Amino acid sequence: MNSKHLSSNYLTPEQNIFYKNNGYLAPLPAIGSMLAEETLSKIELFENKYGDFPQKGLKAHLYLPWMEEIVRHSNILEAVESIIGPDILCWSSRFFIKNPGEKGFVSWHQDVT
């Protein structure tokens, strides 16, 4: 990624320090509410068509073009680049779906890879 094209979502030194100390960074307004709503609609359509497959499916960015768009979104890539540098590979993607009223949770975690 060419650093001449970085947007305002490129992480600040303070955000980088927070990430290195805590293993996460939030909030990070990367995609905006319109794209988030569009993506939710697409996830719901996919879930209605294929049942609970999205909860089990891995590497969604390989077979869903709209998921690949999220993975390749410049704001997301710029934030990741500021932490690990420009050599970025999406190893996996997955939906963690928890509908309202469902028991259970998806815990916070820090990847070790």
Label the model's feature ranges.
Residues M1-T113:
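Non-heme Fe(II)-dependent double-stranded beta-helix
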